[in-house]
Amino acid sequence: MVANNAVISVTGKRFDESVGLYLAICVVPKKGLAPTPCGGGVNKSGVGEGSFWISSNPPPYGVGLADPFKPGGRFNYKIRVSQKIGKFDCKKVKCAVTVRADHLRSEDRSYDLYLPITFK
């Protein structure tokens, strides 16, 4: 269990470095659907602590916005978690630390990972 507005560490390893990922806290969707909504929104500025774009080969517009993987498909981020994601309350709906393929493979559900999170 975590407290609202807490900062948690998320570490990943052995991810496919040829596939960009998003990392965020999201409402767990119905099977087969993309995780959404997600806290932190779409991180277009490349700064912040609510969501992250991880890609070692982003398109030209993503250079400087996406963070590259560390060797071995690794990453480590600190994410600020909020009990509320838009109108959804994570005490009432299932939420998770979520990894998914980025917008270049937005329909590919094979990269989706969910680590359930509960709030105090």
Model regions and ranges:
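Extended, solvent-exposed regions of the mature portions of secreted/cell-surface glycoproteins
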Residues: 1-120
